[in-house]
Amino acid sequence: MSLPPLTLYLAAPRGFCAGVDRAIKIVEMALEKWGAPVYVRHEIVHNKYVVDGLRAKGAVFVKELDDCPDDRPVIFSAHGVPKAVPAEATRREMVYVDATCPLVSKVHIEAERHHAGGLQMVMIGHAGHPETVGTMGQLPDGEVILVETVADVATITPRDPDKLAFITQTTLSVDDTADIVAALQARFPAIVGPHKEDICYATTNRQGAVKAMAPKADAMLVIGAPNSSNSKRLVEVGRSAGCAYAQLVQRAEDIDWRALEGISSIGITAGASAPEVLVNEVIEAFRTRFDLTVEQVETAQENVEFKVPRVLREPAGA
């Protein structure tokens, strides 16, 4: 029996970004240097496959520093941590490595700079997301006002409307954030913004590729974790760019094949913490059911790389 034809559009860029790549390397190098167990505060990146792989090598994932012994190394996740966390690790004389993405650290520095200049911060982000918690935790309580939607902008009550600056989570929807920024600027004309957009290159590029791919595809799958902010945004971007059926799947076994009956094209992308091995697994699952033609939809090229901290580049005992 011949298989039905299907065009599979593959978004590029997709998958791992430089910050995720660096964070995973940090855990692997820490295990090489210090042996197991190495403790990691929160999931190093939001992807079950990656976390399970590191756990098998000897990484122990915990919620808080209280769950770590004093005498084993601890790594802080790529999302960033409140200032109180490294301060506590230092007090306990722990060996720690900060795997915060450098582009998240840039937002932290920005927040501190504006705070030092007497400005109150408005953060555009998702409540409870580790990155938002970490960024807001760079400043004293009450110094950062969280805004999640355009509607929130109308309800906030800053100390002084003329002394405000805004920052954003790095993994937001580019379009939604632009709407919130416009609302902030309309209500608070004096508000100061970042020199360069806080939403990172990888988030922007992956959303750009989805926008180019979505109108061509009958359906779209985003490979990513349900707790991955940037992956969930890719689903939303796909839907708003004209693809009626856009779904998040962790891996091939999650695909709802009945929902895909009768399609002649599908778009595939992956969130910034999803490894390429899971993309290949999904493509192979389609290959067993369809006569597949794969077309890459490339909208940008990436060559960003971040160095790991010096402590991991030095031999043990150095």
UniProtKB/Swiss-Prot annotation:
Cofactor annotation remark: Binds 1 [4Fe-4S] cluster per subunit.
Molecular function in Gene Ontology: 4 iron, 4 sulfur cluster binding; 4-hydroxy-3-methylbut-2-enyl diphosphate reductase activity; metal ion binding
Binding of isopentenyl diphosphate, residues: H46, H79, H129, S228, S229, N230, S273
Ligand binding (dimethylallyl diphosphate): H46, H79, H129, S228, S229, N230, S273
Active site residues per record: E131 (proton donor)
EC number: 1.17.7.4
Pathway as given in its UniProt record: Isoprenoid biosynthesis; dimethylallyl diphosphate biosynthesis; dimethylallyl diphosphate from (2E)-4-hydroxy-3-methylbutenyl diphosphate: step 1/1; Isoprenoid biosynthesis; isopentenyl diphosphate biosynthesis via DXP pathway; isopentenyl diphosphate from 1-deoxy-D-xylulose 5-phosphate: step 6/6
Matching CDD domains: lytB_ispH
Keyword terms: 4Fe-4S, Iron, Iron-sulfur, Isoprene biosynthesis, Metal-binding, Oxidoreductase
One Pfam family from the record: LYTB
Source organism, top-level taxon: Bacteria
InterPro entries for the chain: LytB/IspH
Binding residue positions for [4Fe-4S] cluster: C17, C101, C200
Biological process terms in GO annotation: dimethylallyl diphosphate biosynthetic process; isopentenyl diphosphate biosynthetic process, methylerythritol 4-phosphate pathway; terpenoid biosynthetic process
Catalytic activity: isopentenyl diphosphate + 2 oxidized [2Fe-2S]-[ferredoxin] + H2O = (2E)-4-hydroxy-3-methylbut-2-enyl diphosphate + 2 reduced [2Fe-2S]-[ferredoxin] + 2 H(+); dimethylallyl diphosphate + 2 oxidized [2Fe-2S]-[ferredoxin] + H2O = (2E)-4-hydroxy-3-methylbut-2-enyl diphosphate + 2 reduced [2Fe-2S]-[ferredoxin] + 2 H(+)
UniProt cofactor(s): [4Fe-4S] cluster
Keyword flag Magnesium: no
Top-level EC class as recorded in UniProt: oxidoreductase
Binding site for (2E)-4-hydroxy-3-methylbut-2-enyl diphosphate: H46, H79, H129, T170, S228, S229, N230, S273
Role this protein plays: Catalyzes the conversion of 1-hydroxy-2-methyl-2-(E)-butenyl 4-diphosphate (HMBPP) into a mixture of isopentenyl diphosphate (IPP) and dimethylallyl diphosphate (DMAPP). Acts in the terminal step of the DOXP/MEP pathway for isoprenoid precursor biosynthesis.
Family: Belongs to the IspH family.
HAMAP family, sorted: IspH
Protein name as catalogued: 4-hydroxy-3-methylbut-2-enyl diphosphate reductase
Organism: Dinoroseobacter shibae (strain DSM 16493 / NCIMB 14021 / DFL 12)
Lineage: Bacteria, Pseudomonadati, Pseudomonadota, Alphaproteobacteria, Rhodobacterales
